Amino acid sequence: MSKAPLIAIVEDDEFFRQSMRRLMRSLGYTTEAFASAADFLASRRFDETACLIADIQMPGMTGIELYARLIEAGHEIPTILVTAYPDEAIRTRALTDGIACYLLKPFDDNDLMDCVRKTVEGGKPPAGNS
């Protein structure tokens, strides 16, 4: 029996972190949740992570900075960014830099589920969700 793909969630807001974790588990994924980018980096779970969901605005290191650091270190983890602070310039840059999906909080669970499924399956996320 194959192991369920690991979805890593990096979110400083505990409510959103736990909500996303429950949603991913309900879809059959293995999850690890981290309160900060530093916590995720310290975990060293890069190679087993099938998809990373990261908040953009976090203390210490943003989700965009986390993604850039992972890429620089050779860890190309498909990444979904979430934010409560929409910024078209950041969205455009993130998608140009390879972010798989960009979602605004509060987002519909179905939008996140679609992004994760497409990312884990190796397909392109639906255009409306990025």
Segments and roles (model prediction):
Residues 11:
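Conserved acidic carboxylate
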Residues 35-36, 62-65:
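Acidic catalytic/metal-coordinating carboxylates
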Residues 58:
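Receiver (REC) domain active-site loop signature in two-component systems and cognate sites
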Residues 65, 86-101:
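Alpha4 helix (beta4-alpha4-beta5 surface) of REC/receiver domains from two-component response regulators
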